Regions:
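Conserved P-loop/Walker A NTP-binding site and adjacent catalytic elements of P-loop NTPases
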Residues: 65-67, 72-249, 256, 274-299
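Conserved C-terminal RecA-like helicase domain
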Residues: 121-123, 131, 138-147, 282-357, ...
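Conserved two-lobed SF2 helicase motor
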Residues: 158-173, 329-341, 349-369
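Conserved segment of the helicase C-terminal RecA-like domain
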Residues: 374-377, 381-383, 389-430
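Compact beta-sheet-dominated globular domain cores
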Residues: 851-893
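Helicase-associated low-complexity/disordered flanking segments
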Residues: 1-84, 88-92, 297-328
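Conserved interdomain hinge at the start of the Helicase C-terminal
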Residues: 254-280, 287-290, 344-353
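Non-catalytic terminal extensions of ATP-dependent helicases
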Residues: 2-3, 8-21, 332, 351-352, ...
Length: 893
């Protein structure tokens, strides 16, 4: 049957002009909340009338079918089959290809569930995908009917449809078991069932929610008969497999020995655009994009259209400037290290058909909505964190399956590049032509030693091989056991049942039972859990065994086992700090940072910088080269309070055993930014991590949330309150994509992760903006004290203070003074002033930063006007009328 819908043309920004993944793709765009309006309301009618009764399954199916028909969407056979199975109360495993409308089936399931009065869940593996689907569902079901839970974000959590990460649902299932209010679940990207670290969260709900209807979705499932049989056994309901749908857009494959630039040129000439070029590192993706940008990828008309569509996007960061140039040439970049606003822009431009080429990583395979015609694989190997290896069949099909745009293409194209040495050999052969003598003289290049290679047979084997059977994963942790104990009753028996009924091998089950025994023993010995035998009732048989009851003796923290499981430890550890200490605020920040997930790319850059400094110092001290190499292995990034925190955590784990599931990770990212007076842009520049600025932003957002939500008010001094305001200001200013999307959905107040902003004020967050400007100016003082004139020139060239002008200014300073001080007095508010008199009329602050000298003359400094609008838009201090020198000269100017 024909169909005009696809789940590959989804928009991540409601109202952006592209279709929602749940709204039917190229069908008529749904009016806001039009499908949700067909369901009886979950809320008390405003007019005081009686709520309408819930629909029957048949009625719910008919209403959904009518909604799709009214919008010109004709369901494919496999979609209708799956929806009818769901309406009949069966489970469905939907293993159809990418682009075959799985999202529309999921929407039907969620609608039919809520219309029957069932609470429904949509789960996905990553927060970005959860967020995307949340906004898509809001568009078609209405704002009141959809909520989101990701551990750090809670929106409308009482809604009938909840979008969440798989771990959220798994923890609820452990905590509530059969009594959980979970009517139906659509599990997207179900191949994560086999993920070694996270697969447990996909298996646990299937084992512990016997009254829940499931739909398991993925384009690369492989053999799922064992999963289907297990689901039927646990729930008593039939599990239907819908796995034989044809690809709506068939694929063709080509293995090429041309250079990547040549491959792209040939594909463009052959009308095979848009292309997504897959790399297995972010650096490689950017390198290719920069190379291709010089090849005239886009026409003048395309470049103009891209420029128009990108209006309103701020490209203020270092990577942003690179991306702006690349987009202007028709080349996009897409990977996880980018700021969200840049990724969303690239996706939006792709959805509008404006980008001929996108260079990205294999994140393409994780549900992102980038409609493309051709996938080009630059390699058939990847580094998996341990070693280089060839792609597995599932990985290959996840990526290759994104080729071909339903509703646009008659076929999709998948191209694999040969290894570089094979491409070179092909060039030599082509140059020799048919001349036997020249052919004999060719010295073929070999793969480098240790290189994991591939060839055409590798490619063909991947095409023909079905995805591997999903290997089930299960683990037992202190947190999981605690959650099960919360139910009351015989928690150990329930954990035994969880293990015994799982799909693990007998050997794995035996190991899990031993682990469960160890955890229960630890929890009981520590007094956190008590085990009680309840005697049988008087009328029970004489051989009746006593009932066993496990109970907690402590109150669990709110949001236990979610995204910040070490928050209780942080609260306890704060008592170790002396509020009167000069380092109190920075030490508190270090404690917070130790509980956060590592931003690995940032820490690697810190370690590189530390090792470079150490090598230079050892070389200057005359240390022999071999010894330098040996010593350098012990040099790493800063880990403040490491010994204090490790000792405190060991003691804490004795009292709170479930903390053993987690690890502290001392580091200094936020602290380093503060101590070096760096703003976001300056810190990126300092470490040379422009390609990972999205990683830094996410880390700072987590740090802000922890400081703002976890640190008690009584533990916050004035300095810390300033820092929290500044950090929130920076995070919102650098990238407010999530806030913007929610505003587009109509209700900015519901996003509790965003601190409130002022209304009708030029400066929305005065405290945060003030600290941002103070830090920016004191960073210049610090750089001047260290005589880092080149860095000063790079910071201030845009407002007239080049490296040469800074050098002249500092030369003049040092004719009068020996040094520039950077101690506590130099950083104090007495050395910094703001004149706000023109804030409302001109949207500027007049600022003055004094340099502290050894004589206390305080006669040199920086004066300038802060552009408040640009500063708040970009999250960095933007100046006008900026000058440096002796104050009497500046005042004359």
């Amino acid at each position: 049957m024909a169909q005009t819908t696809t789940d590959t043309a989804a928009s991540t920004v409601s109202g952006a002009g592209a279709a929602s993944s749940f709204s039917g793709g190229t069908g008529t765009e749904a009016e806001f909340g039009s499908l949700g309006a067909l369901s009886p309301t979950w809320w008390e009618p405003e007019d005081g009338s009686e709520p309408k009764p819930w629909l029957t399954p048949d009625q719910a199916f008919e209403r959904f079918f009518e909604w799709t028909s009214d919008r010109g969407i004709e369901l494919w056979d496999h979609q209708e089959e799956a929806l009818m199975d769901l309406a009949a109360g069966d489970h469905v495993i939907l293993g159809t290809p990418t682009g075959s409308g799985k999202s529309l089936v999921a929407l039907g399931m969620l609608f039919m569930g809520m219309a029957q009065g069932k609470r429904c869940y949509y789960t996905a593996p990553i927060k970005a995908l959860v967020s995307e689907k949340f906004f898509d569902l809001v568009q078609v079901l209405g704002r009141d009917n959809v909520g989101m839970i990701t551990g750090d974000t809670h929106i409308n959590t009482k809604a009938p449809v909840i979008c969440c990460t798989a771990e959220i649902l798994a923890n609820d299932a452990l905590r509530e078991g059969e009594g959980a209010d979970v009517g139906c679940v659509a599990m997207d990207e179900f191949h994560y069932f086999a993920d070694p670290d996270r697969g447990w969260a996909w298996q646990v709900p299937l084992l512990t929610l016997p009254h829940t209807q499931f739909m398991l979705m993925s384009a690369t499932l492989g053999d799922v008969t064992a999963i289907a049989a297990s689901l039927e056994e646990h729930t008593g309901a039939t599990c239907d497999l819908v796995v034989d749908a044809p690809r709506p857009v068939p694929l063709s494959y080509d293995y090429v020995t041309t250079s990547l630039e040549g491959t792209v040129e040939l594909a463009m000439r052959g009308g095979e655009a848009p292309l997504y070029i897959v790399h297995f590192s972010q650096d490689a993706a950017l390198a290719t994009a920069q190379s291709l940008a010089n090849f005239g990828i886009a026409s003048k008309e395309q470049r103009e259209a891209i420029k128009e569509a990108a209006k309103g996007t701020s490209f203020s960061t270092a990577f942003g400037k690179i991306l702006k140039r690349l987009l202007g040439c028709g080349v996009g970049v897409h990977h996880a290290g980018m700021l969200p606003r840049y990724r969303l822009l690239v996706e939006r431009l792709a959805q509008q058909g404006l980008l001929p080429v996108i260079c990205g990583t294999d994140t393409l395979g994780v549900g992102i909505n980038v409609p493309i015609h051709t996938v080009v694989l630059t390699a058939l190997t990847k580094f998996d964190g341990y070693k280089m290896r060839r792609l597995r069949a599932r990985e290959f099909h996840q990526i290759a399956g994104r080729a071909g745009r339903s509703g646009f293409d008659t076929e999709g194209m998948v191209i694999a590049e040969a290894p570089e040495h094979e491409i070179e050999n092909a060039k030599l052969m082509a140059k020799a032509g048919d001349d036997p003598k020249k052919l004999r003289k060719i010295k073929k290049k070999k793969a480098p030693e240790g290189f994991v290679t591939w060839n055409k047979q590798t490619f063909e084997r991947l095409i023909e091989t079905q995805p591997e059977t999903l290997k089930p994963r299960l683990r037992i942790t202190h947190s999981m056991v605690i959650s099960v104990v919360e139910q009351g009753g015989d928690a150990r028996a329930r954990v035994h049942d969880l293990i015994e009924t799982s799909l693990q091998t007998p050997e794995e089950k035996a190991k899990l039972e031993v682990r469960a025994d160890e955890i229960f023993a630890t929890l009981i010995d520590s007094g956190v859990v008590v085990r009680t035998e309840v005697p049988p009732a008087p009328d029970a048989p004489t051989d009746a065994a006593p009932d066993i009851d496990y109970a907690l003796t402590v109150d669990l923290p709110e949001d236990f086992a979610l995204d910040q499981p070490l928050s209780p430890f942080l609260l306890a550890a704060l008592e170790l700090l002396d509020p009167e200490s000069e380092t109190y605020t920075m030490d508190l920040i270090s404690m917070v940072e130790a509980t956060l997930e590592d931003p690995k790319q940032v820490l690697r850059a810190q370690e590189r910088a530390a090792r470079d400094r150490a090598m230079a110092e050892m070389k200057a001290d005359g240390v022999e080269y071999e010894e330098r190499l040996e010593r350098i292995q012990d040099v790493t990034y800063e880990k403040p309070l490491e010994d204090l925190l490790d000792a405190a955590f060991d003691k804490y784990c004795q009292e709170v055993p479930w903390a053993n599931d987690y690890q502290l990770s001392p580091k200094s990212v936020l602290r380093d930014m503060l101590e070096s007076a760096s703003d976001f842009k300056g810190y990126i520049q300092k470490l040379g991590i422009a390609r990972s600025e999205g990683i830094l932003l996410r880390y700072l957002a987590e740090a802000y949330r922890s400081l703002d939500r976890t640190v008690p008010i009584e533990k916050r001094d004035e300095r810390l309150r300033d820092i929290i305001s500044w950090l929130g200001f920076v995070v919102r200013s650098v990238d407010s994509s999530l806030v913007d999307e929610w505003e587009n959905a109509g209700n900015p107040a519901a996003l509790d992760a965003a601190p409130p902003q002022g209304i009708d004020e030029v400066v929305a967050d005065r405290r945060g903006c003030t600290l941002l400007v103070r830090n920016a100016l004191f960073r210049r003082v610090t750089l001047a004290a260290r005589e880092h004139v080149r860095d000063l020139g790079e910071l201030d060239e845009d407002w007239g203070m080049s490296e040469i002008r800074w050098q002249k200014a500092l030369d003049a300073y040092h004719e009068q003074h020996e040094e520039i001080l950077t101690d506590g007095d130099a950083r104090s508010a007495a050395m910094f002033s703001i004149d706000e008199s023109d804030e409302k009329t001109a949207h500027v602050w007049h600022v003055h930063q004094i340099f502290a000298d050894e004589d206390g003359d305080h006669d040199f400094g920086i004066m300038g006007d802060v552009d408040l609008d640009a500063t708040q838009d970009g999250g960095e201090a933007i100046f006008k009328n900026y000058r440096v020198g002796f104050i009497e000269d500046l005042l004359e100017d």
